[in-house]
Regions:
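PRY/SPRY (B30.2) beta-sandwich protein-interaction domains
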Residues: 1-201
Length: 201
């Protein structure tokens, strides 16, 4: 039973626009000064309710979220950050704003993230919803188990997704898809991301 990790650097539109992967393919880091250094993991969906955590080691430009596996963002040579396109969703760690189809600084949603904070991500690909939380509390009174107060309700349910993050210089995240032992209990009905759970109908 293998858990998801970041086994490859999928972002290929710009040879300079990459990040490094370490710590058993769970820590993603952007060390160069170029804007954005996203990396992506194995796909989830279509369908299912999924949960993971992203411990922010350094907040440098970090924007964790999801992207459709077919998104132009994966091959974008302009270095647009996650949440720029209509088929990717993210939050901005520096201010907690949420982004989707947004070329600006996002929409007010949560609170700023500091180093060593744990960002929670719950994705409902059955009903097209996504939530983010911080250190055990979902933003904006979100309740994934009840399906209420989602950050977005327009997540496409017919395509698979990668978990991903934009990063600027120094940005770093330690991801946990269940193999490290979650810092917080997943919402009822939401699963860790491993081969057994992905294989379930």
């Amino acid at each position: 039973n293998n858990h998801m990790n970041f086994a490859s650097l999928v972002r290929g539109g710009d040879a300079d626009n990459i990040a490094t992967i370490s710590n058993g393919n769970l820590t993603t880091t952007r060390s160069a000064s170029k804007h954005a250094g996203p990396v992506t993991g194995t796909a989830i969906g279509p369908g299912g309710k999924w949960y993971c955590e992203a411990k922010v080691i350094n907040t440098g430009g970090v924007q964790p979220g999801i992207t459709a596996t077919t998104s132009d963002w994966l091959w974008d040579t302009i270095e647009n950050t996650l949440g720029f396109y209509d088929d990717n969703w993210s939050i901005i760690a520096s201010n907690g704003n949420k982004r989707n189809d947004d070329s600006g600084s996002g929409v007010s949603y949560g609170s700023a993230v500091s180093a060593d904070d744990v960002v929670q991500i719950a994705v409902d690909l059955d009903n097209g919803k996504i939530w983010w939380g911080l250190n055990g509390t979902f933003f904006a009174s979100g309740a994934p188990a009840d399906g209420t107060n989602a950050a977005f309700t327009n997540v496409l349910t017919t395509v698979p997704y990668f978990f991903a993050s934009s990063m600027e210089s120094g940005g770093s995240i330690e991801w946990d898809f269940g193999q490290l032992g979650f810092a917080h209990t997943p919402p009822t009905g939401f699963k860790a991301i491993n081969t057994n759970n992905i294989a379930e109908p």
